[in-house]
Every structure is written in C-alpha cells, then in structure tokens.
Amino acid sequence: LNTCGPSTGLFHEFEYKLAKKISDSVETVDMFRMMGSGTEACMGAARIARLATKHKNIIKMGGAYHGWSDQMAYGIRVNGTKFTQAHGVPLNCFMFIQETTPNDLDDLEKKLRLNQFRGGTAAVYMEPVGPESGTTPITVEYVKGVERLCRKYGALLVFDEVVTGFRIGMAGAQGYFGVSPDLTIFGKVIAGGYPGAGGIGGKREYMKYLGAGLDSSGKKIHKALVGGTMTANPLSCCAGYFTLEEIERTNACQKAGQMGDRICAGLKELVKKHGLPFVVWNTGSICHLETVGTMHYQINWKKPWEIPAILGETGIRQKEMEHMGAAYMA
C-alpha cells in the first residue's frame, strides 16, 4: 500500500508472485491471469475455448454453478431446470449452452456427438466434486470419463475450482483425482478474503488467447476481451500470495480434510442411531448434510404431475428433523 497503492492498473510484484505460486502448485497451469471474480473467470474461459477450438457450444453439468453471467445462468441448482432459474435473461442467450446429467457419460457423449453437426463443442465445464460444490456428488470414474470424452471430441475441459482449489489440496481437485483440465477457474482463497478473487489458469496453448500482442510464434491472433478495474489489485494479490504460502506451510489442506472426515463420521453415527432419512458425505473439508427434497431420488422430471406428491413427503420428515436438532444439542 505504501509503494503502489490499492489499485494501479499496472503489473506489479505480487501479481507475478501469486501467479507463480499457483503455477508451481497446479501442474496444468502454465500461465495464469487474475480476474475480478469467479463469474468473470468463467466468462473469460468460455471465450478462450471458443477462440481456441473454433466451436460454439458449451456443455455444463446440470445443477452446477459457474457464476451468474447470462450464459451460465442455465441449469443451476437442480439438474434439468434449464432456463427456469434465469429470470431476466433473454432465452436466446442460451442458444449455445447445454446441460448434461451428472454421472451419465452416455448423455454427455450424445450431446458431444450431436454438437458436431451444430457448431461443435468448445468446452465442457464441471465442478470436479459435483454440481454446487458436490451437493450432487459424482464419481472419480465419471470425472475421468469426462476428460476422455473431451479429448475424443476436441472440446476443452474446464475445471471450476473456485471452491476446491487449495482446499482439497494444493493441487486442487485435479491433483486429488489425477485429471488434467485444459483450463482451471480459481476464486475465493486466491485473494486471501479480499475483493477481486478470480482467475484463469491453464495450458499455454490456450492461455495465449488472453491479453494483447502476438502469440509466442509472432503470429497475430484474435484475443479474448477481458478486463476489470480491481482485477489483480496489489492488496488482493499480496493477501492471496501469503495465504497460499501459509496454507502450504501449515499443511492446512490435509488437516482440514481430516477434520471433515471426522465431523462426517460423527454425523453418520447420529443419523444411524436415530434412524433419520438423511445423507452425509464429504470430499475433504467440503461436508454435506442433506435433509430435504432435492435428494428425493424418485423424482422424475419427465413426469411433473408426480412431483407434488413426492415433495409432500418432506413434511413427514419434520419430526425426524426435530430429532436431529435434539441430537445436535445433546
């Protein structure tokens, strides 16, 4: 703050240090660029993917959250909802966005195959632990299957690691699962709790589509339009750099993961003891306790007339939820 102020709009020492720290920690990140938020990073990655592949369509997992931009407001929270949550967004904004059912590789391949005849698939976006930070969990086999299909059909694999980055491990979920995305979205922790927490990292052959000037060969190429007044501001970059340093020094990811395992084990014992119709699971420190309607597996979105009766069962669970609360208080 004493040497360059809170925001200069110019390159500075801690922008470099933070980028290098992320690149050193995450193997697939040859190059990194700060953005103003995870939402902006997701927008930028879509533009990179379309420039790099010359394809149009983006496929995301149904229910996943990749920010609140017009295009990504499709199929959020619950798989199959499509545009129904995107109030205020014209339907033509969703012309080149699709959702695929989590854990269903056949559904994804069907869309990839059909897209070959309607503009191609530029990228497949996924939260590597499942939509909404793993609220709908997915299998390791599915994650690796998505990577395989992206390679087969020439689409970029985009990992949204806003939640999982530097939390599941220093290498994020991709290091945990042993998968190599082409682009990675970062957020939250990379600014140490300060504003401007967003970033895109990835392979050099794709990251070259950001910024100005020529690519490494000297050939002029079209670049993705990105920006932001507070992007890469010195305060946030400095906070982010020292936060990541401290996470690594203290082995915080592993310790937090062990705590997540412990709390979920305890919750599972309570659920079993009281015979509650609840579900508990975790990936490291990302813990879930599901008690309500979105986990009604018998819901069939193709038969909407059956849904009210199924959701009515949630009311029956009120007593069990009271028991759960009492168990917490005991």
Please give the residue ranges for each predicted region.
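Conserved N-terminal phosphate-binding loop of PLP-dependent enzymes in the Aspartate aminotransferase
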Residues: L1-A330
